[in-house]
Amino acid sequence: MKKPWKCMALALLSGASLFAAESTKPNVLLICVDDLKPAIGCYGDTFAKTPNIDALAKRSVVFERAYCNQAVCAPSRNALMTSLRPQTLGIYDLGTNFRKSRPEAVTVAQHFRASGYKAQSLGKIMHIGHGNGEDAASWDVPHFHAKTIQYSLKENQTPTREGALFDNKRPDQLPRGAATEMADVADDTYSDGQIAAEAIRRLQAAKSDKQPFFLAVGFLKPHLPFVAPKRYWDMHDAAKLPQPERLTPPDGAPSFAPQFGGELRNYADIPDGSKPLSAELTRHLIHGYYAATSYMDAQLGKVLDELKKLNLEKNTIVVLWGDHGWHLGDHGMWCKHTNYEQATRIPILVSAPGAKAARSQALIETVDLYPTLAELAGLPARDGLDGRSFAGVIRESSVKHREFVTHVYPRQNMIGRAVRDERYRLVEWKKPGAESTTAEYELYDYQTDPGETKNLAASQADVVKSLAVRILAMPEAKPQLKTTAAADASKRPVSQHDRTQMFARRDSNKDGNLTKEEFLTGQPDPKDAPARFTRFDQNKDGILSRDEFVQGGADRTKP
C-alpha cells in the first residue's frame, strides 16, 4: 500500500491521474453485477430498494447513458476485461473463450498486475459455464467461484438443467428448476452472501499488504433464478410494482429482432415457447427481480462498509457496473438478448479519490472502462483497444465523450449492428460480409418515442442514411468464431424442449404453424433444408405443426 508511484511527475504533467495529491497507488474495487438494469433508486426508480448503491452514488459520477456492447453475459464480460467488442473478437456466444480469438490479449487485470497490483476475482467476473471458464492468467490467486444456480428449499434441491449448464456439465434429461425462491434463511445461504463474506476477508488481508489491490467482485443477482431471503421479498409490495405498459414488439420491427424470454422459459414454472405470461406470473417475476436486486444491494453494502472501516475508501477507485440490461415484460419480452434499450442500457458508477460526485449524460460503453481505470490509476495506456478513456468526464462531468455508442446482437445467420446517439438508435441487420444493400434496418427516435413503439426506418430514410454512414465506417463484424468445442456441440441431438424454443422463434406470425418460408429462413444448410422440411411434414399439408417440427427433429442437430 505504501509503494511510491513510478513516473509520478509525468502523470502530474499530463493530467493523467486524479490522484495528484496522493503518494500511493490507488486501489481498485470493481463491482460487477449480473443482469442489473438501471432499476435502482439513484437512477430514478422509485420502486427500487437499493440504499447501498444509492449511497455509493452520492460520492460517484453516475453515468445516465451507459451501454453494454452486447446484451448477454460472456460477450459483455469479454468487452469489460479486454476492451474488445464482440464484433472484433468474433465471439457472440456463451461458450467460446475470448483467448480462442485473441490468445495474446492483455486483460485489464493483467495490465494492473504488470504495474505492481495484486489482482483477485470473486464470484462472476468472466462467464463460467456453457463450456466457458475463468481466465487464470488474469489473477494472482485462483478465482473464488460461487454457484450461479442455487436454491435453499428442500423441494428445489434436485439437480437442474440450468445448474448443469453453469457447472459445465451436460444437462441431458435433467428437470428444469424453479424461476423464483423465497426462503426465510440467512444472507450467506445464497452465493452473493458468500461472495460478500469472501470479499471482506480479501479486503482485510489487503489492509496489511504492501501491494495495491485490483479486486473484482462479481455478484450473481438479479440473474435468474430470482432467489433471495424472504425479508428482501417483504421489502416490496408486489401490487405496487410497475407493470409493462406495452405487451407487443415495436410496430414494424423485423420478426426476428425481438425475443420472448428463451432463458426464462428454461425454468419449470414458465410457459414454453412464446406464449404470453399471465398478469399474475408477470407481477411475481417483477417482484422477484426487485427482491433479488435488494438482496444483492445489501451484500454490496457489507463490502463497502468494510472498505470504509479499514480506512481504504479514500484511496480506492470503486466502480459499479451492470453487464447488461433486462426486459421485464416490456414489449412482451423477457431477459436480455436484444438490441433494444431495456436490454442494452446499463448502470455505471465511478467513485474516484479526488473526483466530485456528479451525474453525467456522456455516452459511454463497457469497452471504455478498461482504459478509464488505467488512466485514473496513472497506468500507461495500451494500444489496440476498442475503448477510449472517459477519465476526462470524471474530472468534468459536463464534457462529451462519444457522439454515439455501438452494440451488437446476433440473430440466425445475421448480426444486428447498432449505433445509439443522444436521440436515435439505428440497427443494421445483415450477414457478416454481405453488402449493405442487403440490410434490414430498425430506427427508433427516443425524443418522440421513448417507449420504442414504432420502427421508423421505412418513413425516415434520411435519418437512416445519416446514421448508416457511422455503421459503414466501422470494421465489418466478424462472424462467430468456430471452435472444436462449438463444432462438437452442434453435433449433439437437440432436446424436445430446445426444439420447442426453436419453433417459437421461427413462427414469425405466431399462428402455431411454420410455413416453408418460415422454416427455411436463416437455415445453416440452405441446400439440404428443403428436403428436411418435406421429411418433417408428416401429413403433407405444406406446413409444419409444432408437433411435427419438435418430433421430426428431436434426434437431429439441424433446426
Task: Tell where the protein language model's regions lie, with residue ranges.
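Short, flexible loop/turn segments with low-complexity composition
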Residues: 247, 386-387, 479-489
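Formylglycine-dependent sulfatase
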Residues: 2, 7-441, 450-470, 493-495
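Glycine-aliphatic tripeptides that mark coil-to-beta-strand junctions in extracellular
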Residues: 26, 37, 448, 508-516, ...
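Amphipathic regulatory helices of Ca2+-sensor modules
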Residues: 515-527, 546-556
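Extracellular/periplasmic ectodomains of large secreted or surface enzymes and adhesion receptors
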Residues: 277-280, 483-495, 506, 516
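Intrinsically disordered, low-complexity Ser/Thr-rich linker and spacer segments
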Residues: 488-496, 525-528, 553-559
